[in-house]
Regions:
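Phosphate/anion-contacting hairpin/loop surfaces
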Residues: 70-160
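Extended, highly charged segments
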Residues: 1-70, 74, 85-93, 110-114
């Protein structure tokens, strides 16, 4: 399972590559991840412009211009790859992925942009994608998890 620093590196890398981009098309190849992906997932993400990529604990949050969001958890073996559309060159940050050969049967979700696509690859299918329509839904979802590890509220007094 990716640890918090790895998830933060993925967030930073995605912020550099997809922030400000518009999703052109979403393709779900397998809805049976840890939680079943809803049938309107593609419709929800289609044509959304990415405002920023946040992180809460080990969750990646794609925040869109309309303040809706897509929340991603990588599970045990999930990885995110950015691949150029025409020549299949992997443009993912190479410092945290050793092998760019992606078995296609584990490419469960593709989010397509103009010149490249984001591929979610997960052999064990323990990761998941969900979406939230606004800030209130997002905050309600994460309220039960306690403070973010880098939040000033997370100190020795909170623990003890």
């Amino acid at each position: 399972m990716p640890e918090l620093p790895e998830v933060e590196i993925v967030r930073q890398s995605l912020n550099k590559k997809i922030k400000g981009k518009v999703i052109k098309k979403v393709l779900v190849r397998n809805r049976n991840l840890r939680f079943k992906i809803p049938y309107n997932f593609e419709q929800f993400l289609n044509k959304k412009k990415i405002k920023k990529i946040d992180r809460f604990s080990k969750y990646l949050i794609l925040v869109f211009q309309d303040n809706s969001a897509c929340v991603i958890h990588l599970g045990m073996t999930g990885t995110i790859h950015l691949v150029m559309k025409n020549n299949f060159t992997n443009i993912t940050n190479t410092s945290f992925y050793n092998n760019f050969i992606l078995p296609k049967k584990h490419n469960h979700i593709e989010i397509k942009f103009n010149n490249f696509k984001l591929i979610y690859n997960d052999p064990r299918r323990f990761g998941y994608f969900s979406y939230f329509k606004n800030d209130e839904e997002i905050n309600n979802n994460f309220r039960k998890y306690g403070p973010e590890p880098f939040d000033p509220l997370f100190d020795r007094n909170y623990i003890f």
